[in-house]
């Protein structure tokens, strides 16, 4: 899965079978706030979202960002994937 950081739209995005799947974000002081997941009908499968989030975590490591999970679904991703907990800012407990 190839992920594009569309800074203009403030979202990480990918195309699957010609359909756009994205995670919207806002950015502040080396923290990225993941604010919304956009998944078209037929792509609600957790595998797609998990793969997209795994790729976003790789980008966060590369850019030395901390990740603030605003959505319950993204907080659940952190609980299921404790290897990414070091990306959480100090004081954020999941």
Show the residue positions of the predicted features.
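C-terminal structural segments of small proteins and small subunits
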Residues: 59-94
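Glycine-rich acyl-CoA binding loop
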Residues: 45-53
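A conserved beta-turn-beta hairpin within the catalytic core of GNAT-like acetyltransferases
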Residues: 27-35
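Active-site rim helix/loop that mediates acceptor-substrate recognition in acyltransferases
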Residues: 1-11
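A short, internal acetyl-CoA/4′-phosphopantetheine-binding micro-motif in the GNAT/acyltransferase core
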Residues: 38-44
């Amino acid at each position: 899965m190839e992920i594009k950081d569309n800074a203009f739209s403030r979202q990480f995005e990918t195309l699957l079978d010609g359909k756009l799947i994205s995670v919207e974000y806002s950015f502040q002081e080396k923290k990225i706030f993941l604010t919304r997941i956009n998944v078209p009908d037929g792509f609600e499968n957790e595998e797609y979202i998990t793969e997209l989030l795994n790729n976003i975590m790789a980008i966060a490591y590369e850019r030395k960002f901390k990740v603030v999970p605003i959505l319950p679904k993204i907080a659940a991703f952190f609980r299921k994937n404790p290897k990414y907990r070091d990306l959480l800012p100090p004081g954020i407990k999941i």
